[in-house]
Amino acid sequence: MKHMIRLLALLLCLISLTSTALAYPAGFLVYHGDREQKRIAITVDDIYDADVLRMMHDLSLELDFPITYFVLGAQIRDTDKEVWESIIANGGEIGNHTWKHPYLTEITKHNARNQILLTQERIDELLGYHYPLRLLRPPFGKFTQELLNLFDEYGVQKTVMWDVSYTDPQEAFKATENGSILLFHTNYVDYHCLVELIPMLQEAGYELVTVSELIGMEPLQTSEEKYVFPYR
């Protein structure tokens, strides 16, 4: 009887752990879109260099393709408000890349939460309205099941990874397939890669869309009331 009780207790423990580990919704973690559709998404992380940000945005306007930017809250400057407004107005989108790019797996749950929410507050402060950062890319691509649950708890709808990460246009082109999410950063090497790569992708028949379009999300709903970080 004692043996049976121990087995039942172990089973209940395993069920509880599994339930906790998989608390986030199915499809919450994304590496690519539909492999049956010739659509891809260009993503740019960090935004350390505002000059390169402007160059990439100008390129997206010139070649008529959208970019999904995963921003660091600490790098959002008031002087860049105009370019962010233009990005949104011209079909681009903004996702969360945390406040200062830490290894989220090496900080406390509360600090990880703050990294997410402070960035939401900063983007709302810049734009003057609530722009939900429903996409998140964890720095270095590092996460745990617990962190995925945390992202879900604090308003993230999709954790977005990638399946192509090359700074050489030929290598990036060869690695790209239907549904690919391509990763770049705001530096001159990546900018010049995009200058060559985008026409190649377009000539190959790829439709370039935002990440949210690629994975079939509903249009973003903004609102007047800005988010204010409540944990100071």
Question: What are the residue ranges of the model-derived segments?
Answer:
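Positively charged n-region of N-terminal signal peptides that target proteins for export
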Residues: M1-L7
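Residues in and immediately flanking transmembrane alpha helices
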Residues: S19, D58-L59, H110, I198
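Catalytic domains of cell-wall/extracellular-matrix polysaccharide-remodeling enzymes
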Residues: D78, P102-E207, S212-E225
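Short, compositionally biased "basic patch" segments
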Residues: Y24-G27, I94-H97, P138-N149, F229
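Active-site beta->alpha N-cap acidic-glycine motif
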Residues: Y24-T105, R122, G216
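Hydrophobic core
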Residues: L12-T20
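Structured C-terminal subdomain patch of bacterial secreted/periplasmic proteins
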Residues: E225-R232
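N-terminal entry module detector
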Residues: I5, A21-A26
